[in-house]
């Protein structure tokens, strides 16, 4: 009876609210949203207004006026906007002057001019009308590149999505390269076509090396293997701006006695030495020099970026001391957050294992690398995740904690680190949100003040009367993110796949093959997530995850923090729901989408709470408590099922595909029904 009721409930929800799988992609291809104008608004005395019949010399901007603002505009010269290239401006710089009779734009080049037009669009979106305040602005993007992976599909970039990326201020894309015309999207990809399509909308292309070439340059066949792999790629794709190397993806048989000279799959777990990919080996500079020589033979201007991500658990000085030995011209990329040690206010200490925004992330490790790069006059990049997402929640579209993100944006602008460029997302990709909108302005010299900007966004999206209520919800969500505990058990466990994570105390060990994952996924669950709670040494070895057993005191302190998070997320959701009740049309729909994102975070935290409480009860043999939290988690998963049916982006991640979608959550519910039966019914 319970099973039939759950299925019936799910079917009713799916009929009334369900969005087809991948329906969110249609939203990603909307370059200009329709109907953004509030027809009741009139221009002020100090504003210029675009009127019907206006001519502008940019087709994209004309489309914006027509579609978003309802202004009948056409493309033509000597119209309301005059745009010219000014050689006297710095790279990426533009000047906008709004007068009573029109707008003048000067840009350092074509890309700068396009960013100027996008800025005009942003201003009118905030105004909700085709009006611009009179005055003069000088603006410049602080960082270049600002590169992102695709949030449409793993290494999939349709034309309109590329345009959307450019509108949000990013200036580069990055995708996996495995071989000539082979990416994470599969073989026979038109890589050069993608490079050209990106170039046409003002985006550079970086290749993320996932090339299989286990070779040492000092070995007899080593340089031949390097030429046969990296040389082929550079020759085939010379239009790429650069290539990114990271330890785990460029393993080689190092001769450094401090490491195991084998591939990851051949690691000896009884040998305490790390693998070459996870250690600053003394012969990394030799390997890089050999690869660089081959790449530049075929593509002389291809930039080489070495990302130190996998070194975060090694001695900071050891890592920084190796950087001066790298070949000249190699850019260094550090990582924010990884390796940070956070002490929470209840005494819990967390060693942050992977990408997190629970801390701004400016560790001594990161600072030492930045200093070494600066001393050697090298370009220093940062893996910042500031497109809006980290591994804190694996299948959410973005983390809605703007005031916490601000700490990172502000830190990156600090000149002591000398940051030149950013990687702003890994393979979990980019989804447009108010977070990336705020980041764009924060990363612009001459940009709008943060407090002013976020207040205008709140008023635009939820109405002036609701702005303060919405701001307070965002403050709560931001404040509570510092309570997140970024250890491996959380990031590879309940927070990776949220309410799809199994509650299985008393059941058989779950095998990865049992999990209903799309077989086309680039990353399988065997690599991406632990499905048993808590995970054990065997699972950790299988996935090369640092295993740290958590004692009961740690779990209880962690639960204190999680329960705060649950309250704060729930309070924020409640406030936004109240605000949304006053809205209608597209504004209401967008508000409900954000509410769903907030509630997904709330439900994910609830899953973590129920798992920890259930485990502690199971450990002490308290079956009634196990069942109590089983019922709580069953209800939580049912509520989450409605969320993922309503918004097809929730529960999805580009490399994992649907890891917590309707199918996965229903699978979890069925397992719980089989394991606990009628005990799941509310007493």
Question: Can you describe what each PLM-predicted range is?
Answer:
Residues 1-8:
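Sec-dependent signal peptide recognition
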Residues 9-18:
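Hydrophobic h-region of N-terminal signal peptides that target proteins for export
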Residues 19-141:
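Contiguous, structured surface segment used for ligand recognition
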Residues 32-35, 47-55, 83-87, 106-108, ...:
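Structural motif
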Residues 97-99, 141-142, 236-237, 324-327:
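Extracellular/periplasmic catalytic domains that process cell-envelope and extracellular macromolecules
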Residues 134-151, 207-214, 381-391:
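N-terminal small/glycine-rich loop or linker at the start of catalytic domains
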């Amino acid at each position: 009876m319970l099973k039939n009721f759950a299925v019936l409930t799910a079917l009713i929800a799916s009929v009334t609210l369900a969005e087809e799988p991948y329906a969110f992609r249609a939203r990603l291809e909307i370059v200009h949203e329709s109907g953004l104008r509030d027809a009741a608004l009139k221009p002020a005395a100090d504003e210029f207004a675009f009127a019907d019949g206006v001519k502008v010399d940019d087709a994209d901007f004309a489309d914006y006026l027509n579609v978003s603002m309802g202004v009948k505009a056409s493309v033509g010269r000597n119209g309301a906007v005059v745009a010219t290239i000014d050689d006297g401006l710095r790279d990426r710089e533009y000047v906008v002057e709004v007068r009573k009779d029109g707008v003048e734009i000067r840009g350092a080049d074509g890309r700068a001019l396009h960013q100027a037009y996008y800025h005009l669009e942003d201003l009118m979106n905030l105004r909700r009308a085709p009006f611009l305040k009179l005055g003069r602005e000088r603006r410049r993007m602080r960082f270049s590149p600002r590169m992102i992976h695709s949030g449409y599909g793993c290494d999939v970039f349709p034309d309109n999505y590329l345009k959307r990326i450019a509108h949000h201020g990013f200036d580069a894309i990055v995708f996996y390269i495995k071989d000539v015309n082979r990416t994470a999207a599969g073989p026979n990809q038109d890589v050069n076509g993608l490079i050209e399509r990106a170039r046409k909308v003002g985006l550079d292309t970086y290749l993320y090396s996932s090339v299989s070439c286990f070779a040492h340059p000092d070995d007899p066949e080593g340089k031949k293997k390097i030429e046969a792999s990296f040389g082929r790629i550079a020759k085939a794709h010379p239009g790429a701006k650069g290539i990114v190397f990271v330890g785990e993806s460029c393993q080689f048989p190092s001769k450094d006695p401090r490491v195991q000279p084998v591939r990851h799959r051949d690691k000896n777990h009884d040998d305490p030495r790390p693998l070459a990919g996870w250690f600053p080996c003394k012969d990394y500079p030799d390997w890089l020099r050999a690869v660089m020589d081959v790449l530049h033979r075929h593509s002389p201007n291809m930039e080489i970026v070495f990302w130190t991500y996998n070194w975060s658990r090694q001695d900071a000085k050891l890592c920084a001391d190796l950087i001066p030995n790298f070949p000249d011209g190699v850019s260094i990329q550090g990582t924010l957050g990884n390796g940070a040690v956070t002490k929470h206010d209840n005494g819990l200490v967390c060693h942050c294992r992977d990408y997190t925004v629970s801390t701004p992330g400016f560790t001594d490790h990161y600072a030492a690398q930045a200093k070494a790069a600066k001393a050697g006059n090298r370009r220093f990049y940062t893996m910042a995740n500031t497109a809006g997402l980290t591994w804190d929640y694996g299948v959410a579209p973005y983390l809605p904690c703007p005031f916490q993100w601000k700490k990172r944006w502000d830190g990156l602008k600090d000149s002591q680190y000398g940051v030149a460029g950013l990687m702003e997302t890994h393979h979990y990709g980019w989804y447009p949100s108010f977070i990336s909108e705020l980041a764009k302005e924060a990363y612009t010299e001459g940009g709008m003040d943060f407090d002013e900007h976020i207040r205008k966004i709140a008023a635009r999206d939820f109405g002036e009367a609701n702005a303060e209520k919405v701001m307070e919800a965002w403050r709560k969500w931001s404040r509570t993110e510092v309570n997140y505990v970024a250890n491996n058990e959380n990031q590879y466990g309940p927070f990776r796949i949220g309410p799809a994570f199994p509650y299985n105390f008393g059941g058989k060990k779950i095998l990865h093959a049992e999990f209903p994952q799309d077989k086309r996924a680039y990353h399988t669950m065997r690599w991406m997530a632990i499905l048993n709670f808590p995970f054990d040494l065997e699972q950790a070895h299988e996935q090369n995850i640092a295993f740290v057993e958590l004692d009961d005191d740690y779990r209880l302190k962690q639960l204190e923090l999680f329960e705060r998070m649950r309250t704060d997320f729930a309070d924020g959701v409640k406030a936004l729901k109240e605000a949304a009740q006053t809205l209608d049309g597209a504004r209401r729909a967008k508000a409900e989408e954000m509410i769903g994102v907030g509630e997904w975070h709330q439900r994910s935290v609830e899953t973590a709470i129920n798992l920890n409480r259930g485990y502690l009860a199971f450990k002490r043999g308290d079956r009634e408590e196990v069942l109590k939290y089983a019922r709580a988690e069953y209800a939580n998963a049912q509520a989450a099922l409605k969320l993922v049916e309503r918004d097809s982006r929730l529960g999805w991640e580009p490399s994992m595909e649907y890891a917590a979608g309707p199918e996965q959550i229903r699978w979890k519910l069925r397992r719980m029904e089989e394991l606990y039966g009628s005990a799941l019914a509310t007493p």
